[in-house]
Amino acid sequence: MPRYAIVEAPSALGHVPEHLGVERAPEVLLEAGLADGLAARLAGRVEAAGYSAERDPGTKVMNPQAISDYSPLLANAVAAVLDEGEFPVVLGGDCSILLGTMLALKRRGRYGLLYIDGDADFYQPEVNPLNGAASASDLAFATGRGPDVVADIEGRRPLVRSDDVVVFACRDAADRERRGCQPLPPDLLVVDRDQVRRLGASAAAREAVKYLTRDEGPADGFWIHLDADVFDETIMQAVDDPRPDGLAWMRWSRRCVSQWARVAQRDYR
């Protein structure tokens, strides 16, 4: 298996002021020994600049140009890791860093996305519940839905095809409907929190892997996005919106990761 290489992405460009602090996550995780635990190389840090708490009047998105400028820089850092034959581990930051990681992969071929998150993050800007913060819309932008400045970075819309995405363990369907979120595309596979519980963690993980590795699917591999808010608030308070009824860490980690680790040995270069 390739060696892990950690890229720090301490960006809060996709967050509202009330949720600032996520940009400290990389240093906190490294201080806690993550690099040693993974025997990982530290492959650099991509700083974000230009944060503003104001919503752009044209796009209804916060910091759209800053996110558009940051994403290629992060993509370059991820590409450098891949060029070394290593396995990139990108530490955010808020969920808008997804645009940089998926941009790195879109430059190389057709990649899928396993989106493990308590929320589907698919809001259109005009109904975004976080004052246009991209962290509530990043999956929509990555699949090409939204203003060009964030949804067509480098003219590569979409960064990932809808039919190459699995949204795993989300539990926000009622909130999305109540707030008028655009519907998730029918060709995007959703394995929500209730399905994970009904199928069991191992079977749900196998379902996700089977879909992403199908013959007509993304031939070059897939990215795993993990937002800590997928976990229950009793075990994960260090998120902007701790909520009950999420995944339990031990059950999830032992059963799901074992399924996904098998595909980590694929050649992503």
Residue spans for each PLM region:
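Conserved alpha-helical scaffold segments that buttress catalytic/binding sites
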Residues: 2-269
